[in-house]
Regions:
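IMPase-like, lithium-sensitive Mg2+-dependent phosphomonoesterase catalytic core
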Residues: 1-134
Length: 134
């Protein structure tokens, strides 16, 4: 391994989301992003889930793929995208959520089931979950 005993930072100063989606998402997520910006966090979005996750894993941050008006259940596939990265995140001290539930607790109902997806530094994901559930 290139990084033995890897640990994801509990907090970060990076948020990763396609901000082109902002007209179509929950206003609470917009509030969260504004909060991140006020605290000095920077936006970093490559457009590759794995590359974006890897950067946040090393430096600390959160990746957001919320549901939109067009994709009411999100776009990330639960079984072969979200679960794999959620497992890795939890092994290094991070967290993954659909905004309500821990990703690894979601019982799949279909092979290609999609889910909203929030993954990264534990404190950032917890804060977003609190905002989404308030």
């Amino acid at each position: 391994l290139s990084h033995p005993d890897m640990k994801m930072p509990e907090d970060g100063n990076i948020f990763t989301m396609n901000e082109g989606l902002t007209p179509m998402i929950n206003p609470n997520i917009l509030s969260y992003l504004e909060s991140c910006k006020r605290q000095g966090a920077s936006a970093r979005y490559i457009g590759s889930l794995v590359a974006d996750f890897h950067r946040n894993l090393l430096k600390g941050g959160i990746y957001l793929y919320p549901p939109t008006n067009k994709a009411k259940n999100g776009k990330i596939r639960l079984i072969y995208e979200a679960n794999a990265l959620a497992f890795i995140a939890e092994q290094v001290g991070g967290m993954a959520s659909d905004g309500k539930n821990r990703i690894l607790d979601i019982q799949p109902e279909s092979l290609h089931q999609r889910t909203p997806f929030y993954i990264g530094s534990i404190n950032m994901v917890k804060k977003l979950d609190e905002i989404l559930n308030s």
